[in-house]
Amino acid sequence: MENEVNILAEEKPKSITLSDGKEYKLPPIDMTTLANIEKTMGFGLGKLQSKLEDETITTMRSIIYALLKEVQPDLDIDEVGHLITLKEMSSISETISEIMALT
């Protein structure tokens, strides 16, 4: 059974490099992280798809901020927004896709 998946295995944090050239860690996506993302964004993940359709950039910035806030609580949302260019948005799209897959 080589393809067996260990559902208890801990997911490793990911890192992204933002426009300031610094590497930032993204937390593993677990229940606490997801709950904190909802709290930070002010809406449940069930509304994420419609929010992305209606307010794409605002919602993307909120997701990225919520993720970074887990590891870097000193960042504020405007600061995070200034650190994100289209290049950075594409580099974290996989993580955002993982979150959306759960909704």
Where would I find each of the regions flagged by the language model?
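Short, surface-exposed, charged amphipathic helix/loop patches that serve as local interaction elements
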Residues: 2-13, 25-103
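Glycine-centered positions within short beta-strands or beta-hairpins
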Residues: 18-24
